[in-house]
Every structure is written in structure tokens, then in C-alpha cells.
Amino acid sequence: MAKIELKPVGTNLLKSVSGESVELQSLWRDKPVVLFFLRRFGCQVCRWTAAEISKLEPDLTAHGIALVGIGPEETGLKEFKEGGFFKGDLYIDEKKQCYKDLGFKRYTALSVVPAALGKKIREVTTKAKAQGIQGNFTGDLLQSGGMLIVAKGGEKVLLHFVQDSPGDYVPLEDISKALDISANVQAGERPQCNDDVCTR
């Protein structure tokens, strides 16, 4: 993937959960930030990943690092918030311009089916189910997501991750390493999967 230019993407507008419009760059102006771009708020894998990333929140806060979740639409936001899946601030990219500028692809109706049935997504859904995390199929099923970690003031991109499959996510140790912090968290147990079944 080409190098991300923060200046143009930084001027994209997001909507806070309270309805206020903010520029993306305002999120890294005063502190480093971990930006988690969800596929959608009802996505079971996204909910599990949000809960997993939230394990880092105390360590991020202790180091003055913001944790932010961004969704491509408002659909499912209320249920996502009520479920307590994510400990950071939440925003909506209503125009999906950040998603486009950061290279988070859109599936087609034909390409989403094999992606959704792949081994990676089965592994994560097994983890989610084991933790009682459910999902739904409301909203835009074709949008992918990823992560962007930016240094304070937008000095540089510390990590840019684009989902190749809906089950892809950044391991907690990679997030900590990108930020050069140590975190006292235990990642969720990884299930063992073959082509037919996943077990814990």
C-alpha cells in the first residue's frame, strides 16, 4: 500500500456520537491516537475486535494515547454502545471518505460471500461466540475496515492496517509495539480451525 498522506485525509469530517462534526486530524492534534475503523457496528467480528482492542485502553490512557472507533454509518451504533464493546470514543464517517482515502476496500456482492466464509473469519467468530458476543446483518455488509495509528500532531503514521479479509485484525502486541509501550493484557484465546470446524 502506498504511503498515507495525513494532510488530505486529516481534513475529512467525522460525526461524533453527540452529532458534532470534527476533522479527523483533530483526533491526533494533541496526542497520539489509535483509530479503529469498524466494518459496521453490528458486525460480530468487529464487536469482538473492539472488545479485544479495549483491553489496551488503561495502558493507552496511562501513556496519553487516545483510543477511537470509527464506523461507516450510524446503523447499529446504539446497540454497539449499549453492548459496551468499545472503551474509546466513537465517530461516524458518514461519507466513508476516510475509508476510501485509507484504502479500506469495498467488497462486491460476489466477493463478500467467500470472504465471509473463510477460515480467518470462522476463527474470530468462534472467539466471539465463546465470549457471548453476537452480531447481526444490518447495515452495509460490503465495507471493509482497518486501523490507523498516528503520532501526536500527525508527525507520522505509526501503523496503517487494511483488512484483506473480514476476519483480519491487528494483534494487541502489534498495537503496543507500534506505540512503543508495554501493555499488561492477555489476548483472547486463538481457536484451532480446519476447513470444516473451529474449536477453542
Curated annotation (Swiss-Prot):
EC id: 1.11.1.20
Gene Ontology MF term list: oxidoreductase activity, acting on the CH-OH group of donors, NAD or NADP as acceptor; prostaglandin F synthase activity
Family: Belongs to the peroxiredoxin-like PRXL2 family. Prostamide/prostaglandin F synthase subfamily.
Listed CDD domains: PRX_like2
Any Pfam family matching the protein: AhpC-TSA_2
Primary enzyme class: oxidoreductase
Main localization of the protein described in the UniProt heading: cytoplasm
Reaction(s) the record says it catalyses: prostaglandin H2 + [thioredoxin]-dithiol = prostaglandin F2alpha + [thioredoxin]-disulfide; prostamide F2alpha + [thioredoxin]-disulfide = prostamide H2 + [thioredoxin]-dithiol
Subcellular localization(s) per the UniProt record: Cytoplasm, Cytosol
Gene label: prxl2b
Record protein name field: Prostamide/prostaglandin F synthase
Listed GO biological process terms: prostaglandin biosynthetic process
Alphabetical UniProt keywords: Cytoplasm, Fatty acid biosynthesis, Fatty acid metabolism, Lipid biosynthesis, Lipid metabolism, NADP, Oxidoreductase, Prostaglandin biosynthesis, Prostaglandin metabolism
Organism, scientific name: Salmo salar (Atlantic salmon)
One Gene Ontology cellular component annotation held by this UniProt entry: cytosol
Free-text function comment from the UniProt entry: Catalyzes the reduction of prostaglandin-ethanolamide H(2) (prostamide H(2)) to prostamide F(2alpha) with NADPH as proton donor. Also able to reduce prostaglandin H(2) to prostaglandin F(2alpha).
